[in-house]
Structure formats: structure tokens, C-alpha cells
Amino acid sequence: LVRCHISGEQPLCYMDGIILDDCTFDAACDRCFEDSKNINADIVGAITEIKNPISGRIAAHNVGKVTYDEFAKGKQAMITLR
């Protein structure tokens, strides 16, 4: 997905190989990328919450919260701020 706006509750969960380029997230989005793997995401702006991503990389200007709970299937995702 290129230059798209993501909205909704728990978006982009259970995905494999998702590519996001210059996308934005609505502030109401929470628990993004849960159980997703091989993520390649370049986000413009902020992500409210990322929950239990398995692997890949997520870059954003701001991340409000990163959650790994007891149900996390992996912790190999690299989350960076720009």
C-alpha cells in the first residue's frame, strides 16, 4: 500500500508480508500489526499502539505504545522512530 490512510480498530493484524510506504494511521487505531510477520512499514506521523508484531520493521515519527503480552508469538520486529 502506498500513501494510504489506515483507520479502524486493530488494523493490519494477522498479515504476512505487508508493505506500507508513506502511509498514515488514524489516531483511533489501536493494537496495530497484532500477530503480523515480515512487516515492511514506513509510516508518516504517529501510530497510537502496536501490539505483538512478530517480525519485520516498522518506522514512524512517533509510537504511543508498544505492547507484547503473554500471547506474543515472537519479538523480532524492529520498531524505530524517525
PLM region descriptions:
Residues 8-14, 28-34, 51-55:
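Short glycine/acidic-rich loop motifs that flank beta-strands on beta-rich extracellular proteins
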Residues 15-19, 35-40:
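Short "repeat-start/strand-capping" segments in structured domains, especially the N-termini
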Residues 18-19, 32, 75-78:
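Residue-level detector of solvent-exposed, low-hydrophobicity positions
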Residues 38-82:
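Terminal non-domain segments
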